[in-house]
Amino acid sequence: MDPRIVKLADLLVDYSCRVQTGDKVLIDYEGDCCKDLVRQLIKKIYAKGGLPYVDIRDSAVTRELLLSCSEEQITFMNECSLQKMKGMQAYIAIRAGGNTAELSDVPSDKLNMYYRLTSPTLDYRVNETKWVVLRYPNNSMAQLANTSLEAFEDFYFDVCTLDYSKMDRAMDALAALMERTDKVHIKGPGTDLTFSIKD
């Protein structure tokens, strides 16, 4: 197992979701290239005393469903998803689909209906669970970055496996300054920007 994947799994479970004994964790992933990370997450969650569950997504299958879906169908899909989500304490999503434009030809009324009717599950997940969503490096992402997959993976793992708890502590002074600040003025060559950060 690539040690960078082990480190990323540790970060997602320990820092991002703070998985505890007994936590039910839904791992929701798309793309074959992230299976090693999914497997490592399962191992790590078990080691923490948690219970991993896995959903597998496929944008091509989702596209086919959405092209002819009905409101009744999506409403029921949301009821099932929401019931499952209400049983979870944490959610880890990994997105590594091969085609970022797979849903581009789904009619906007179908997509809007889907997003509107499934929003209760999203709202519950965001407000009631410990969660993290990340993209995972693949050929599609490397191509969008105009780089090789290997170079993109190196960049990705360097950025995604930083010591975020250390960064969090390092930002305490800035956060304290921002709490007592109203107006911010940024001035430089070609820039003169003033704005409020109050509330």
Could you say what each language-model-derived stretch is?
Residues 1-199:
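Active-site bordering "gate/hinge" segments
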